[in-house]
């Protein structure tokens, strides 16, 4: 019997609010981000799910989101595995810069290429392809076997690390994944078949406000 995989992007962080490239830097959630995470947890509580294990990154904004979701479903002490493989895309030299300042320094077109191309990394950083090259193997070795054994698994992570998973799960092209934005705090519930393909997907909230 296959299990359930739930993906949740962390709530708004301080640097999201300030329009900064975040990457592997470690800002906390804003008050809105906390409320977004709680809302995602409530949606999962209303859905009626109980998790067997949770996975998150080593960054505080994802860890706090994970804990707030678990609090909401009444599983505050659930085993949670933290791994760097689930970290956000590393923006390298862009990390910590205001996005407008980055455009002024390198030009709007170049920054757009770094942000929205699939395989062109910023200086010292990762492309979306590079991010997927660490996220997907970790999923295959550590997360997927738990789901295929019938467990209900929570993954609270980041926009680009989760897009790397969604790209394969939803069978999206490079062009499609570049246009996909995931809303903060909105759970995506996947039921998987025994062959690891997707049997069904439900989005518990509104993705229209994704950025």
Swiss-Prot record:
The reaction(s) this protein catalyses: (2R)-2-phosphoglycerate = (2R)-3-phosphoglycerate
GO biological process: gluconeogenesis; glycolytic process
Enzyme class per UniProt: isomerase
Annotated substrate binding sites: 9-16, 22-23, 61, 88-91, 99, 115-116, 159-160
A Pfam family reported for this protein in Swiss-Prot or TrEMBL: His_Phos_1
InterPro entries xref list: His_Pase_superF_clade-1, His_PPase_superfam, PG/BPGM_mutase_AS, Phosphogly_mut1
Enzyme Commission (EC) number: 5.4.2.11
A molecular-function term among this protein's GO annotations: phosphoglycerate mutase activity
Pathway of action: Carbohydrate degradation; glycolysis; pyruvate from D-glyceraldehyde 3-phosphate: step 3/5
Family designation: Belongs to the phosphoglycerate mutase family. BPG-dependent PGAM subfamily.
Function summary: Catalyzes the interconversion of 2-phosphoglycerate and 3-phosphoglycerate.
Self-association state and partner proteins as the record states: Homodimer.
Name by which UniProt lists this protein: 2,3-bisphosphoglycerate-dependent phosphoglycerate mutase
Organism of origin: Rhizobium meliloti (strain 1021) (Ensifer meliloti)
